[in-house]
Amino acid sequence: MHRAVDPPGARAAREAFALGGLSCAGAWSSCPPHPPPRSAWLPGGRCSASIGQPPLPAPLPPSHGSSSGHPSKPYYAPGAPTPRPLHGKLESLHGCVQALLREPAQPGLWEQLGQLYESEHDSEEATRCYHSALRYGGSFAELGPRIGRLQQAQLWNFHTGSCQHRAKVLPPLEQVWNLLHLEHKRNYGAKRGGPPVKRAAEPPVVQPVPPAALSGPSGEEGLSPGGKRRRGCNSEQTGLPPGLPLPPPPLPPPPPPPPPPPPPLPGLATSPPFQLTKPGLWSTLHGDAWGPERKGSAPPERQEQRHSLPHPYPYPAPAYTAHPPGHRLVPAAPPGPGPRPPGAESHGCLPATRPPGSDLRESRVQRSRMDSSVSPAATTACVPYAPSRPPGLPGTTTSSSSSSSSNTGLRGVEPNPGIPGADHYQTPALEVSHHGRLGPSAHSSRKPFLGAPAATPHLSLPPGPSSPPPPPCPRLLRPPPPPAWLKGPACRAAREDGEILEELFFGTEGPPRPAPPPLPHREGFLGPPASRFSVGTQDSHTPPTPPTPTTSSSNSNSGSHSSSPAGPVSFPPPPYLARSIDPLPRPPSPAQNPQDPPLVPLTLALPPAPPSSCHQNTSGSFRRPESPRPRVSFPKTPEVGPGPPPGPLSKAPQPVPPGVGELPARGPRLFDFPPTPLEDQFEEPAEFKILPDGLANIMKMLDESIRKEEEQQQHEAGVAPQPPLKEPFASLQSPFPTDTAPTTTAPAVAVTTTTTTTTTTTATQEEEKKPPPALPPPPPLAKFPPPSQPQPPPPPPPSPASLLKSLASVLEGQKYCYRGTGAAVSTRPGPLPTTQYSPGPPSGATALPPTSAAPSAQGSPQPSASSSSQFSTSGGPWARERRAGEEPVPGPMTPTQPPPPLSLPPARSESEVLEEISRACETLVERVGRSATDPADPVDTAEPADSGTERLLPPAQAKEEAGGVAAVSGSCKRRQKEHQKEHRRHRRACKDSVGRRPREGRAKAKAKVPKEKSRRVLGNLDLQSEEIQGREKSRPDLGGASKAKPPTAPAPPSAPAPSAQPTPPSASVPGKKAREEAPGPPGVSRADMLKLRSLSEGPPKELKIRLIKVESGDKETFIASEVEERRLRMADLTISHCAADVVRASRNAKVKGKFRESYLSPAQSVKPKINTEEKLPREKLNPPTPSIYLESKRDAFSPVLLQFCTDPRNPITVIRGLAGSLRLNLGLFSTKTLVEASGEHTVEVRTQVQQPSDENWDLTGTRQIWPCESSRSHTTIAKYAQYQASSFQESLQEEKESEDEESEEPDSTTGTPPSSAPDPKNHHIIKFGTNIDLSDAKRWKPQLQELLKLPAFMRVTSTGNMLSHVGHTILGMNTVQLYMKVPGSRTPGHQENNNFCSVNINIGPGDCEWFAVHEHYWETISAFCDRHGVDYLTGSWWPILDDLYASNIPVYRFVQRPGDLVWINAGTVHWVQATGWCNNIAWNVGPLTAYQYQLALERYEWNEVKNVKSIVPMIHVSWNVARTVKISDPDLFKMIKFCLLQSMKHCQVQRESLVRAGKKIAYQGRVKDEPAYYCNECDVEVFNILFVTSENGSRNTYLVHCEGCARRRSAGLQGVVVLEQYRTEELAQAYDAFTLAPASTSR
């Protein structure tokens, strides 16, 4: 179908691939960075005639060029074969395809097709065919090596560029398939639900491009209007090969979707012809049109490529700036198992018209490009052809590609593990790199939306990850979409950040990619089957929601939304897509076992779902550029809008495989909310991810029963039960078709889909909700109505009620009512799977973590369930719930809802979007009429009030919900209105009766169980009965939300997990029960309405569900105990909580103003208790100074010395004889030696008045004062040495003279040495040389080495010294300083910086007199300073001893002789005066003791209050210590842990406020030895989140500010760049890893 992805070197990094080159026969030509004129995109002839011979390549705009060097020149890689005649191979090709159309499960034919393509060096198509052969049972031993060889060849070609430019001799398999399948479509057109299947549009129709397209290089222009693409190649029109994704069904308004065509090939275009000329056309907007598989497949490759070298195509697939020929859709995509060739996938993704200047090649090569240039939409939009249109244009992508992708989606999702290349399809994150391949236009246009696979994620992932779905990789293997960086709220911002910030901080590695123009919002448009991409969950009604989400959702919901006008209905989130995949029964493929997922996918599934990675799982089928469609939906803030939906998804992805983690590293991800993986953690505790033993088996049985029930329901609904669809076909179809197929049908599918189908399932589920979905997978796709038509009445689309339900569920996202009974699940065959995934968290993909697994499971719900109880557990209830009232894929809706809230810059505010959604839902409900609901059992009715899913519906009702919704009569609508009113009343009533009703409901449910002998699942939502649960769900806003919350209460964007979690379904119940308990009527249940309303009222809440099996007699009861995850208030956090709890609570916290919580807990204080009330006698006011006399070196290294010095009760310790015992050579610090070593070294000089040490007189000498004169100046060591020497000589001279005078006047006894007791009135001026820096290790090497002889705790540097963990130099603290003194030199009173300890050694020859006061009295001394008009922290003051004594403050006073070491303990207030000529050396030490740490933090906070700089960045130091030191002291551990806790809270609160405000946050990791940052204005430490401005607009000087100062400069932070130095995941990991170490026994 598509040419193999270009090898890394094949094209210029920034070169985009021209879609025109995609024409089946035309030579491949790379597109210029911008989309070429539409002509370039014109598809080759679609008729069989054109298939035989390649049409002339569409004229490329001058800019189109394949050569990396010259875009305007066609470039053929050296040695690339030129187009050759097909000879007779076309006939063989047609014959094989025709045979496969009849029966896809013919591995021999697939292998033959592969050989045909291989003979023509079309490794992409050959690989797809071989993969399909494997899917259908081909010999892996034989095909595996071939695939590996082809992939190697592709990779090589990709690097050489040969295959990229080589014209395809044989038409792409997808083209042929589509053309031949047209006949089938014509026959079954009506079934598909769209207008009768169109014949493939003639090439001319497709080729003609509006002049705009031709002229516009932008992706939008490049993409021709939907009509053009539709005509050219409607994926929907043409059947797709089994392996190919199903084209999304057109979104025509025809009321009844035509019966689904027979399932030709799994991937065949069972979807209606691509009728969405405008509406239905596959467009970036209608990402849905593309089959999930394709969507998933193409984008995934790109994404994956970036991440995994193994991927054959490291570069992003060429982006088709113009509409690629529709027929060019990924026809060759392997129908089944094998992932699509990466190249194909990449080709499959059209660049969503990328604005000029945004080159994909750039994205590939440059990180910025990957991150920012590649728009998530672009990635998602990647389709073999130009599936996505510019955001504003209708999708150009052909339906066929869509269908093909959908078909393949499943299989692609679960490529055979053994198949080489499976690795390629790894994660959306990987895809991102691939998406880089897309033409710039693709990226640009798609930026708003992710590729189907990444569609949802793309929102979160502005960068590449979102754009192309990762190549199909084993479902389990495929990592979920990029995690953290995909966060919903930040998604959009993230995307923008990626571009803007990258440009700002990383520089645009390529021409900046203009943000893709927002796709026109289509209110009514439920994208074509974008099921794959739940991303599109957003409704058209939620334009604020990023377009990307809409696209996904439209794809997934295309079927369900098709008929319903509910543009508002959001498309199911990725999780749903996954589900949809699951529903289709499919034989386990090598990659996926029916029981594959041990729930592994579940965890991944949720995460992947957001990025549409679920779809990606689909054997690399190309994703629709569905994300573009979302973009269309929200043109205003495509980037931002998308961000939010992906946010939830991205969150889910966080837990996803590391691959995703890589993505977060991107700049764009900077914007993501805390890390992706973490978010998952934050969202869901591991315990919730584990199902009880034996649950997997139970779930299998439930799946089977659900499948049967679904089939029955489908029949009842008037829709033929979806044929099992040959397993291969089903597998292929499952990506989208799965919706129609019971979720439970294929455990294997579930596994594969779990990961990738999460998104697909979401979409699928919506489809399933509609009766038509029961038809083969293609029909579900076909079902999707044109996005623009919100009211299409086609039967296949869900009724407005179902759509509303979906929307409600989506909005509710995380809060799903889990009907314990499986009946609800079984009620809807299709919806069931959907329901399972319906919990796609809106913004809480992250929240889904616990749920994320569940949604995944749901995505492949039942199958997955059987294989992994986890999945099935969540899936069943969700399915049921969905069926009942949330039928419209709630998940998608949830993502939609979250996106609006998440979207920061979106056109509308979150509240506005939610309000709009709520109104839309009500309208839908009214339209639909609630006839079905009314018939529902009373209990059901009550329950529906809370959650439509919970209510039991008669089989008829179930049918109606499943497919009859569209046909709801006017009376039904009236009833719905009435029901809505009832819902409101119930909601209010529930608030009052939440406590009682749950139990009553439970009792009723239990009573029912005995009556029903079939297995039944009782949903216990926090002790809520089904009724109560429903009601509570209806009123998510209720405080009772905690109970019903799981189903009803919307999960907070950050906590989407509940949506998935609630899904831990009770196993599905037999069809009979399902019908009985089927969720409310097709009309939206009150619960759904309430959910929607509640969503608008606030974020959904998380809900955890556990399935408990209860056996009694012949009955097996499954109690889905929904453990409502109580929201932790930030104030309730303690150090016992994990980082996930901290992040979650902090994100949900609402803080007014600045976050000012202390880093210290008063309860942790270790200060000694000193009785200050007792009046001390005079002798105690002069206590003896703690002293130690060292007699040997052994004494110096005794632990007792450390304990004595650091004892909080000893403010100061003098160690006598230290130099002698350690044999320190103090001569190294003598003035003479210093002058010789560096005589020109700077010395700070303090000019003072010489006075007695215990006195401090004013200038008049009449009274003592506290202020101390000490003016500052500078000189050199040599000059000060001269002054010191001369001062000494003068002193000697004066001494001699005084002696002579004494001898002459022996009677005189009043004389006193001037130096010791100068007359205050003499004002003898002296100079004190201080703060001489000896930090230069080279210059002062001998001196510093001598100090290494000291005990470890006294050394300048040691592991036990906090100052050694600062990471940078702090002069005078973690470096040595020298003081040169003359008699009278004073060191005024002070406490050391941040209350750290200090070491001072007197070098001699003179003495120093010390005064010290315990830290306990510092406040009293500070008060004295204030009274005397001197600043305690920064001023020079000399205490009046009498004042201290009068205040009952004991003062330690002693003399320090040469060789004595003084240890100043933490916080000790001290002042020193030299009594002789001497030098001193000193430095600070921060022993790791609780006392030291407490005092350091106290002073840190006090400095902030006093606007004084804390020289020691305590928060920075605390994190460094936590990462590098093992703490065994419980008190110290608690203090540090608490500090980290507060730091994380501060970061999260600050981050969330910025994200909510729409401010982009760029990630800029720290580098080695990078200093801590301080605010340029207030000198407060700025940790992690920096507010940077450029000084005077200069690029050379950047200033860091704290948030307060930055906002003072600009309230809206205009002109301020916000940088993030640590990802939330990094901090969380350090936080959780910091544990109390066992105490050492060495002592």
From Swiss-Prot:
Disease: Stolerman neurodevelopmental syndrome: An autosomal dominant disorder characterized by global developmental delay, variable intellectual disability, poor language acquisition, and dysmorphic facial features including a prominent nasal bridge and coarse features. Some patients manifest autism spectrum disorder. Musculoskeletal features may be present and include widened and thickened hands and fingers, joint hypermobility, clinodactyly of the fifth fingers, and toe syndactyly.
Protein name in UniProt: Lysine-specific demethylase 6B
Biased composition (Basic residues): 972-989, 1004-1016
Bias (Acidic residues): 1296-1307
Isomerase is among the record's keywords: no
Annotated Pro residues bias: 242-266, 332-342, 460-484, 584-600, 641-658, 772-800, 889-904, 1047-1067
Residues reported to bind Fe cation: H1390, E1392, H1470
